[in-house]
């Protein structure tokens, strides 16, 4: 990943502190991405040992969030950052919260897989694995965009969530068909629906991280705009950057 071109300050220590928290976010992101990848694999392959490792690894994700958050608070208190520096710190605080929640999803998927699924549910898990891989790629891409604060890439990833939503809706229809055809599948299908919804939410969290990139680069809060208005804003910003 390319290094973000941070502002240069008269205090070399301030530069080092900003670079440290940015690097820590990328380390946390890498861990969460691996946790999610392993969770999807454990669910699909019914790998109990891998699932347990993911559950155990969630504590490290939580500790990293706390450590980065504390480092950000110290920077705000000590350096009183302004403008883009403050936006960077705020974007990091919000991003690590989203990453921690994605880590929680990985944990829940593994706990569910350990308790609820067996080999007889394999047909239900195939579509979940595909959706999971889609969100893993989305997470990987948004972490790369965050490392470079790449606005255009963030816009592309933001729009990618529509495909995740469509894939999720297809899975819901498929699972509902299973239930209607055989009522004995209802408990396992409901569990699969829970997993599918949890995985779909990862796309939403990646969208949130995209919004933090928009905020850092443009100094504008894009939350709660939504719909056609947001699409128009994103298109306008892209045209300005490409001009």
UniProtKB/Swiss-Prot annotation:
Family that this chain belongs to: Belongs to the PhoU family.
Induction behaviour: Decreased expression in high concentrations of phosphate and iron. Transcriptionally regulated by PhoB.
UniProtKB keywords: Cytoplasm, Phosphate transport, Transport
Gene3D superfamilies linked: Phosphate transport system protein phou homolog 2, domain 2 (1.20.58.220)
Molecular function via GO: protein homodimerization activity
Single Gene Ontology BP annotation: phosphate ion transport
Record InterPro entries: P_transport_PhoU (IPR028366), PhoU-like_sf (IPR038078), PhoU_dom (IPR026022)
Protein name, as recorded: Phosphate-specific transport system accessory protein PhoU
Record PANTHER family: PHOSPHATE-SPECIFIC TRANSPORT SYSTEM ACCESSORY PROTEIN PHOU
Gene of this entry: phoU
Leader sequence segment: none
Domain of life of the source: Bacteria
Principal cellular location given in the protein's record: cytoplasm
Disruption phenotype: Entirely abolishes the secretion of proteins from both type III and type VI secretion systems, T3SS and T6SS, respectively. Transcription of phoB is reduced by about 25% compared with wild-type. Transcription of esrC is completely abolished. Transcription of fur is increased.
Assembly notes: Homodimer. Interacts with phosphate regulon transcriptional regulatory protein PhoB and ferric uptake regulation protein Fur.
Pfam families: PhoU
Function: Part of the phosphate (Pho) regulon, which plays a key role in phosphate homeostasis. Encoded together with proteins of the phosphate-specific transport (Pst) system in the polycistronic pstSCAB-phoU operon. PhoU is essential for the repression of the Pho regulon at high phosphate conditions. In this role, it may bind, possibly as a chaperone, to PhoR, PhoB or a PhoR-PhoB complex to promote dephosphorylation of phospho-PhoB, or inhibit formation of the PhoR-PhoB transitory complex.
């Amino acid at each position: 990943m390319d290094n973000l071109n941070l502002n240069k300050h008269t205090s070399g220590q301030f530069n080092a502190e900003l670079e440290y928290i940015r690097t820590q976010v990328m380390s946390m992101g890498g861990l969460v991405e691996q946790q999610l990848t392993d969770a999807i694999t454990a669910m699909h392959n019914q790998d109990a040992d891998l699932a347990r490792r993911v559950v155990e690894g969630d504590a490290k994700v939580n500790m990293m969030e706390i450590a980065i958050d504390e480092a950000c608070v110290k920077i705000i208190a000590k350096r009183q950052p302004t403008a883009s520096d403050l936006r960077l710190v705020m974007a990091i605080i919000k991003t690590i919260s989203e990453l921690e929640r994605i880590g929680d999803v990985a944990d829940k998927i593994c706990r569910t897989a350990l308790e609820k699924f067996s080999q007889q549910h394999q047909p239900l898990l195939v579509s979940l694995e595909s959706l999971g891989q889609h969100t893993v790629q989305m997470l990987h891409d948004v972490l790369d965009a965050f490392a470079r604060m790449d606005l255009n890439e963030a816009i592309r990833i933001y729009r990618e969530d529509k495909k995740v939503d469509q894939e999720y809706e297809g899975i819901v229809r498929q699972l509902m068909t299973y239930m209607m055809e055989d009522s004995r599948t209802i408990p396992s299908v409901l569990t699969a629906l829970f997993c599918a919804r949890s995985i779909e939410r990862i796309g939403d969290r990646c969208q949130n991280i995209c919004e933090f990139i928009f905020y850092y680069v443009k100094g504008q809060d894009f939350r709660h705009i939504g719909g056609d208005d947001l699409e128009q804003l994103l298109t306008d910003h892209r045209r300005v950057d490409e001009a």
